């Protein structure tokens, strides 16, 4: 970890500049972020471009009650992704051959243009549609390009960087618990505890996939620190949905690795067991003295989610077939914010499927799910645990709308996972290198010797 920090001092310095300017000269951030992208490119620091995008998205996720002046990153992040996308579009040959992820979702992005005709906020809808497509286009190709340049050292550094983001939560806690906690729940650098939990859940899957594909990438002590950190922060978040999603992945990824049929049968059995337990859940939680941790008083109404789902379903009837354009769900929830708060609900729809339905209708939702399922089913031929990732993700999407948003610190992590499990040159890296595994040891992986465009 310390070696990583020393080796990426330029990224850390730039991040400190972002924070300083964000506090004292907010408007300058709009120019500073894209200039930083070109600075990284000029110095051939391609992983730093991707790491920078991730931390900008984390900063933009900070709520106003955490650091008021950090709100500038909510708007400025658009300029960062535009700079990253601009480099990709102008130098596409550098990234050849391109990642397959975007092509799998291309039918959805082509269709998503049509619902814009029914949008009540056309400018915002167009912006969100473009940013969504750009993320699916840019992130997988940057991940693949960085791997081609640095080999497994890139993923090693990526995991360390994502771990450092979580550990920085301790710094905020040391400054003042009001910065790191909300209503008694830990949130670290993120806007809310559920957001940090989603990040941890996705991080568990990414770190597990990378560690499985290259067993020599991390030493035992490093794995202990990485996974120990993730699990600690996941538990501290108190998020029931993300805990269950992580459990689904951790329990069944070995089943799917042995046999897809065995994994599917085990998953069905798990669902039936959950149904049996849920009918006696209140008694079980009380018996073990975990009523406060699981927020038993909010269990019956799903922390307000059931009300939000019912409210969203009523509005879906107006946009049932074709939807109202991407960001339609945000427009509706914002319009009725005062009413929703009077009913005890805060936030969005808290269900990706319903949010997507509001945005692109049942037609768009079907196309999107077809692409998502197709990607992981095909990937399972390369990485068998892909099916466990798919089912765990599908469960998580039932309780949060994170995949509907593009410029958040969650979608980008899923795109990284998609890239790792779908690209043969990553998943089959040993065959690409004449079947001889790299002996990375404790000091990390050696770069894969591959041609760089």
Label for each model-derived stretch:
Residues 2-88, 114, 118, 393-395:
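N-terminal signal-anchor transmembrane segment
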Residues 18-30, 70-74, 122-128, 191-197, ...:
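Helix-loop-helix junctions and helix-breaking kinks within/between transmembrane helices
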Residues 35-41, 205, 381-384, 388-397, ...:
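Transmembrane alpha-helices of multi-pass inner-membrane enzymes
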Residues 73-85, 100-113, 121-144:
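Aromatic-anchored transmembrane helix interface
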Residues 110-114, 134-138, 152-181, 191-256, ...:
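Alpha-helical transmembrane segments of multi-pass inner-membrane proteins
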Residues 156, 160, 217, 222, ...:
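Hydrophobic transmembrane alpha-helices and their immediate junctions
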Residues 171-176, 232, 254-296, 313-318, ...:
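A membrane-periplasm/extracellular boundary helix in multi-pass inner-membrane enzymes
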Residues 294-360:
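Long extracytoplasmic/lumenal interhelical loops at the membrane interface
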């Amino acid at each position: 970890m310390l070696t990583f920090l020393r080796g990426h001092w330029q990224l850390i310095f730039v991040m400190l500049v972002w924070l300083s300017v964000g506090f004292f000269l907010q408007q300058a951030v709009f120019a500073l972020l894209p200039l930083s992208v070109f600075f990284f490119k000029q110095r051939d620091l391609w992983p730093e471009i991707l790491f920078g995008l991730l931390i900008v998205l984390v900063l933009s996720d900070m709520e106003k009650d955490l650091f008021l002046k950090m709100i500038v990153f909510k708007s400025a992040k658009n300029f960062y992704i535009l700079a990253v996308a601009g480099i990709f579009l102008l130098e596409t040959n550098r990234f050849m051959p391109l990642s397959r992820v975007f092509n799998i979702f291309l039918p959805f992005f082509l269709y998503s243009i049509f619902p814009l005709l029914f949008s009540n906020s056309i400018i915002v809808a167009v912006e969100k549609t473009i940013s969504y497509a750009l993320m699916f286009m840019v992130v997988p190709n940057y991940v693949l390009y960085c791997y081609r340049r640095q080999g497994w050292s890139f993923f090693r550094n990526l995991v360390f960087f994502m771990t450092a983001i979580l550990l920085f939560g301790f710094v905020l806690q040391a400054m003042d618990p009001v910065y790191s906690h909300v209503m008694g729940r830990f949130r670290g650098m993120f806007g809310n505890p559920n957001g940090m939990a989603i990040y941890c859940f996705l991080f568990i899957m990414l770190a597990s996939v990378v560690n499985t594909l290259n067993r020599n990438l991390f030493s035992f002590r490093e794995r202990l620190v990485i996974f120990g950190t993730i699990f600690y922060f996941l538990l501290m978040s108190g998020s029931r949905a993300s805990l269950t999603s992580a459990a689904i992945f951790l329990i069944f990824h070995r089943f799917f690795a042995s046999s897809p049929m065995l994994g599917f049968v085990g998953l069905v059995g798990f669902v039936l067991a959950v149904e049996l337990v849920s009918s006696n859940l209140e008694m079980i939680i009380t018996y073990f003295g975990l009523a406060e941790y699981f927020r038993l008083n909010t269990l019956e109404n799903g922390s307000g989610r059931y009300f939000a789902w019912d409210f969203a379903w009523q509005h879906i009837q107006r946009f049932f077939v074709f939807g109202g354009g991407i960001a339609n769900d945000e427009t509706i929830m914002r319009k009725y914010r005062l009413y929703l708060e009077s009913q005890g609900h805060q936030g969005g729809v808290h269900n990706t499927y319903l949010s997507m339905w509001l945005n692109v209708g049942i037609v768009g939702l079907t196309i999107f799910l077809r692409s998502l399922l197709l990607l992981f089913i095909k990937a399972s031929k390369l990485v068998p645990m892909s099916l466990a990732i798919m089912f765990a993700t599908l469960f998580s999407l039932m309780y949060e709308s994170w995949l509907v948003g593009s410029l958040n610190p969650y979608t980008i992590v899923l795109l990284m996972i998609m890239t790792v499990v779908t690209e043969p040159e990553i998943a089959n890296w040993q065959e690409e290198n004449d079947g001889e595994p790299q002996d990375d040891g404790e000091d990390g992986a050696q770069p894969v010797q591959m041609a760089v465009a």
